[in-house]
Amino acid sequence: MNQKQPPLPVCIYALFHPKAKESAALARSIFRWFRLKEDAEQGTTAGLPVYYRTQCKDGVTSPEMDWSGAKHNVVVVLVDDEMALDEDWRRTLGKLIERAERSRATPGVEQIHFLPVMVDKSLERLSILSQPIRIYSQTDPIEPPRPSTAIPADAAVQGAWEVECKRIQAARGRLRERRLRRSLTESMIRIMRGIDPKALPPRLKVFISHAKTDGAAIAARIRDGFAAISQLEPWFDQNDLPPGFDPFEPMVDGARSTSGGMIAVVTDRYPTRPWCRYEAMQARTPRELIEGGMPWTVQPTVAVLVAGSTWTRTVAPLAQVHRIGWPSASLARPSPDAHRSDVAAAARDWIALDEALQLRLREDECIADVVDRLLLEILFSDVFNRYVQRMNPDGRIILGFIPDGWTLANIKLKGAASRPREILYPGHRLRTPEQKELDTLVSGIFGEGVRVRSLEDHALDALATAGAGDTGGIPNAGAAGTVRVRVALSAGGTDSELWPAGIGSCHIDDLMVRLTRQLLSRNYYIAYGGTLAELDQPKNLTMSLLDAAEGWRSTSDFDLEPDRQPDPVNLINAPPVRNYAAWPNDQKITSSHRAQFLGLCEFISVEPQAVMDPDRKKADALTEMRTKMASDCGVRILFGGKIHGWSGWLPGLAEELLTSHEAGKPVLLLSGFGGCAALLAEYLKGAGGLPLALSFSDELKHRDPGEWLKPGTSRQDRQTKYQSMTTHLERIYAEYHDGTSRIHIIDEANETAAIAVILATLSRLFPRAAPGGE
């Protein structure tokens, strides 16, 4: 389709040297922060686009940055020793600075904002870089001296030194990541608000709403903690106003429309105080940015939840506000009757002191989290408001926040639209139970037939309609009485192989999860193969996919209408996700795991029975797994993928393409996300000749022959497999060029556009796919 989208308000490019490990880690942290991957609970907000650039030549990055894709292009340059020593990068940075200055001097063109980051002292040697974001500090913790080599190394001492080094490196990394994300967020708020980067930026005022009876001390602690770490200026009562000022209007205005937002310290007494409720109401009462127009917005607000011992209730206007818990004070205090000479009493004093210090540190961490999250809410509010002001309402209500009963009722009372045809909220589609709750609220307030959906779904339909001439957008997997299609998803890749495409493995994982949500909510099943990683680890791709299956499957076991609740037996027998695991990784899946995900994920183990050599058995198991997966699934989607260092006989995505072709199944091949999939697409669209990176000789250069070429997987065996792959790919190439192939190459490099093409292609391939069966 290659449908050109209108420019976004902002796009972020993180530039770093491919040899710089710390800069690469910082780039990943930028992606996680602005794509909201730190959110464990919702995961529905879309975030901001973040891309990488690690290569340059002749003063230009590769790939080149698309300045036309956003009104404001923020170029974050992670400057360290490797970049400072690279002549190509120095030349490129000079040209980028010149272009950024020209863009700011030319009204009406896309703006380029250059933000250098001081990762180490090398930036001080580059005179072309000024006003850097300083995340490096000489006071940061450093590794302890290595144990002396003059005497035989003690294993225990060496081990303790290595553990301590890792701990300090991790702590230093977290410290610098936090500095970077806060400074970047503050800088981008100034950019969105048009503040001159050379001028002294005004401090953003933040109102702290709290109950004086049990929240004043915590509110003061938060206020005092702000000064050391941010450019926010907090205030919360008449003591922060000049003498003689009536506090009513400033405090109401503070809750409703201060430049920086509001923090609600929700203690046990907070819901019982009329003034607190009034402040919450003011902050969360929607208002139109443009009178008689749109969008509807609310004050950026976060909540600090202080759990006490009193029964209490919630506050309705704060139902959809992001919140974090305040650290509890569970100190082991010594008995007041203990004698100071008593050793046990002294020990208790020490423990109490240590716990008090730890509590103080946890409070500091919480305050930092509150500052960072509020800054992010302010930035997202500014970005979203700019984005939707270009949209045509056309009978819609467009919201800049996730709605709840309070906000929807207020919009209705203000007479925005007696009966809108549609209500749009920001971000990705809500989880199925949340969406059903929202559907019920909207029906009760605005009447039956008013559709409520995410802006992502709206954008997907708009892209599909513009690109495919489809007048109805993207349908769900369709008509009753037919089968439900299982879609095989195959992706992956290593950072170093994906960086040339301007992305990393985190982008691939993000696309995998977003695509999974869309497919599940549109009545498709999904399947994926490979290792499940460690199921007991809280953060990994597998758990993200299973979370998507639980939250976004269309046949949720949660339904507000009892007569529509699905048969629980069918839910167990037809789980939305299927995982194919090849030997020996399938041995990691225990009965406990299978029971834990019963009705959600079916685990298929694949183990060749007639093979004795373990190395050959591993390779054969992967081939057999991919063959079975191709046979069981109706279509396969390929993107990313390892080029070198894969497991099995052949590159994983290449073998998956071959097995799906052999099974006569259609394949959607995404070329815009790098990796093996991009090489395969390049080959099929080109003039012939397999890419060198997919040859046996090139793979051998990236391997330890002693590990890769073993008795069960000998050189002759592997060369034979490669020759077979080449012959098969040549056959696919011929079919692709004579128009008989079932390979569909999708060239979109933008996630939303790629998903739109995928969904539109699936609806054409399977126009009568529907729930029930496979």
Which residue stretches match the model-derived regions?
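Residue-level detector of buried hydrophobic side-chain packing
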Residues: 117, 208, 234, 262-263, ...
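Alpha-helical scaffold elements adjacent to nucleotide-binding pockets in ATP/GTP-utilizing enzyme cores
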Residues: 29, 92-96, 179, 183, ...
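Acidic/glycine-enriched connector segments
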Residues: 28, 32-90, 102-108, 122, ...
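Hydrophobic, helix-prone linear segments
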Residues: 1-77, 192-193, 201, 205-211, ...
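Short, surface-exposed basic-aromatic patches at helix termini and helix-loop junctions that form
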Residues: 98, 224-228, 253-254, 281-289, ...
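Conserved beta-strand-loop-alpha-helix hinge of the TIR/SEFIR fold
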Residues: 19-20, 55-57, 64-124, 212-213, ...
